[in-house]
Design a protein with these regions (language model features):
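Alpha/beta catalytic cores of nucleotide-metabolism and tRNA/nucleoside-modifying enzymes
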Residues: 1-106
Length: 106
């Protein structure tokens, strides 16, 4: 969960406290359009894994706030994809793609 530095992506859970993110300038999820990953389109937001790692390691309150924004957006988007797949009668294909993506890893 966000308060413990766990961020959810379509390719699995990302543990932002891990040292490998110390210099990683990529967003949490390059396909995500949330404020934490992509910003507001006007120069605000769009934080790197390295910056979130730094905030988390320093105990800054902004770290779990940004992680929560991302995680909520992830689940809202995931549930919309589930509803769309069910409505279109292609949930089986969605489920397979979801499992393949998660197995790929972050």
């Amino acid at each position: 969960n966000a308060r413990n530095g766990h961020l959810f992506t379509r390719f699995g859970d990302l543990k932002i406290r891990n040292a490998r993110h110390k210099s990683d300038e990529r967003p949490i999820d390059e396909t995500c359009r949330c404020y934490t990953c992509a910003g507001d389109g006007q120069g605000g937001g769009g934080f790197s894994r390295a910056y979130l790692h730094h905030l988390e390691r320093c105990g800054e309150m902004l770290a779990p706030m940004l992680a929560t924004i991302h995680n909520l957006h992830y689940y809202l988007h995931l549930m919309q994809e589930v509803r769309d797949a069910l409505d279109a009668g292609r949930f089986g294909a969605f489920r397979l793609r979801f499992a393949e993506d998660r197995a790929r890893g972050v």
